[in-house]
């Protein structure tokens, strides 16, 4: 698996924005990715970033209805990335509109 295929997108929610102050960033990642691969992908994608810890969450599929038919959403995996104290911040999350 290519390192640039591991990270799919950032998770922008109220709780993930609250974790930014603690140096934690939340990404949706490939379901086959393990913690070491996620750490390598984040350090390769963002220059000057050092990862201290990676926590992963497997999100189960939810049942959805379309008319009379019931289906399921895709399962996903989220990774909470904790940076070291001497690491640069990831600018993707800190960009605020002025």
Curated annotation (Swiss-Prot):
Gene3D superfamilies: 3.30.70.330
Record keywords: Ribonucleoprotein, Ribosomal protein, RNA-binding, rRNA-binding
Cited SUPFAM superfamilies: Ribosomal proteins S24e, L23 and L15e
GO CC entries: ribonucleoprotein complex; ribosome
Domain of life: Bacteria
UniProt-recorded Gene Ontology molecular function terms: rRNA binding; structural constituent of ribosome
PROSITE patterns documented for this protein: RIBOSOMAL_L23
Pfam families the UniProt entry points to: Ribosomal_L23
Biological process according to GO: translation
Keyword Transport: no
Record-linked InterPro entries: Nucleotide-bd_a/b_plait_sf, Ribosomal_uL23-like, Ribosomal_uL23/eL15/eS24_sf, Ribosomal_uL23_CS
HAMAP family hit by this protein: Ribosomal_uL23_B (MF_01369_B)
Similarity annotation: Belongs to the universal ribosomal protein uL23 family.
Cited NCBIfam families: PRK05738.2-1, PRK05738.2-4
Subunit structure, as described in the record: Part of the 50S ribosomal subunit. Contacts protein L29, and trigger factor when it is bound to the ribosome.
PANTHER family with a match to the protein in the record: 60S RIBOSOMAL PROTEIN L23A (PTHR11620)
Role this protein plays: One of the early assembly proteins it binds 23S rRNA. One of the proteins that surrounds the polypeptide exit tunnel on the outside of the ribosome. Forms the main docking site for trigger factor binding to the ribosome.
UniProt-recorded name of the protein: Large ribosomal subunit protein uL23
Organism: Streptococcus gordonii (strain Challis / ATCC 35105 / BCRC 15272 / CH1 / DL1 / V288)
């Amino acid at each position: 698996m290519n390192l640039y295929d591991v990270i799919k997108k950032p998770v922008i929610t109220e709780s993930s924005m609250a974790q930014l102050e603690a140096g934690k960033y939340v990404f949706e990642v490939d379901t086959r990715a393990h913690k070491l691969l996620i750490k390598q992908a984040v350090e390769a994608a963002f220059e000057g970033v050092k990862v201290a810890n990676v926590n992963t969450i497997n999100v189960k599929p939810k049942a959805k209805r379309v008319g009379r038919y019931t289906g399921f959403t895709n399962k996903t995996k989220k990774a909470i990335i904790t940076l070291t104290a001497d690491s640069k911040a990831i600018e993707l999350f800190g960009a605020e509109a002025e």
